[in-house]
């Protein structure tokens, strides 16, 4: 097992250097650990936190907020923020996990479905897995067309028996999608995937990623929240869904959680490697 442990340690060290560089480049200092109350306007710590996450994940912009109730809520904001009536969403690795099925509208009671993407007029389809295990690249190429607005790429296998997606697989998916429709948004559910590799999905061709701070990037100590990162326009649209149009990423008091989130991110590469 020595070679495997060496591989994990190499990934840990690479990602730790990446996080440290983001802290250094953005001049993280004690004044960024404090927050403001009320509307949360002009919160310097929140702005720097967003910039640090954006650099770590190689994004144009990041939205790091404790107001996300869960990973599912974070993903829902990204989906609802970037999809409107008549748009089409395609899940590329079979059905997503249970809570996301309720967000999309393929599961849940009638009231849940009424509030879902499908209930709001978004079209949905999914690419079945090969033998319930692997992405069907040929079928993906067949199903993506000019009407496909967004593809959902669930990186982790969740509670299913399929394989989690490697960076190589995510890159191949994005290449196929962009070749068929350059305007299609490649959105990666990055929950449980942060810092398990030297690359993150945006480096492999994705346009948008989202995840939970109570999982990998929170280092096991962040108490709540999530993040969305990627192209600036897509992130800001997601922010409009989290708060409101006209507020977007400019508002939202952080309740003195900056320091813990900075600390969690600092610890994350080491904690994930363990």
Model-inferred region functions:
Residues 60-67:
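Short, well-structured beta-strand/strand-turn elements
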Residues 1-59:
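Glycine-rich phosphate-binding segment of PLP-dependent enzymes
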Residues 9, 18-25, 29-32, 55, ...:
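Conserved PLP-enzyme active-site core in the AAT-like
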């Amino acid at each position: 097992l020595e070679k495997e442990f060496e591989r994990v340690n190499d990934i840990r060290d690479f990602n730790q250097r990446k996080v440290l560089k983001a802290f250094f480049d953005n001049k993280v200092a004690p004044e960024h650990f404090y927050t403001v109350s009320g509307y949360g306007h002009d919160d310097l710590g929140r702005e720097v936190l967003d910039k640090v996450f954006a650099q770590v994940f190689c994004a144009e912009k990041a939205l790091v907020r404790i107001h996300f109730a869960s990973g599912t809520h974070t993903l829902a904001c990204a989906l609802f923020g970037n999809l409107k009536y008549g748009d089409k969403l395609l899940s590329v690795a079979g059905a997503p996990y249970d809570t996301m099925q309720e967000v999309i509208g393929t599961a849940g009671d009638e009231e849940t479905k009424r509030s879902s993407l499908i209930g709001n007029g978004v079209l949905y389809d999914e690419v079945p897995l090969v033998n319930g295990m692997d992405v069907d690249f040929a079928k993906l190429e067949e199903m993506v067309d000019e009407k496909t607005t967004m593809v959902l790429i669930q990186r982790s296998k969740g509670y299913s028996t399929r394989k989690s997606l490697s960076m190589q697989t995510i890159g191949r998916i994005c290449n196929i999608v962009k070749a068929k429709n350059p305007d299609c948004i490649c959105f990666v559910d990055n929950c449980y995937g942060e810092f398990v590799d030297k690359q993150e999905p945006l480096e492999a061709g994705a346009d948008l990623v989202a995840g939970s701070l109570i999982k990998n990037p929170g280092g096991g100590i962040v108490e709540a929240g999530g993040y969305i990162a990627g192209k600036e326009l897509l992130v800001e649209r997601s922010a409009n869904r989290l708060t409101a149009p006209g507020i977007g990423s400019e508002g939202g008091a952080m309740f003195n959680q900056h320091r813990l989130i900075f600390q969690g991110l600092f610890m994350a590469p080491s904690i994930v490697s363990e």
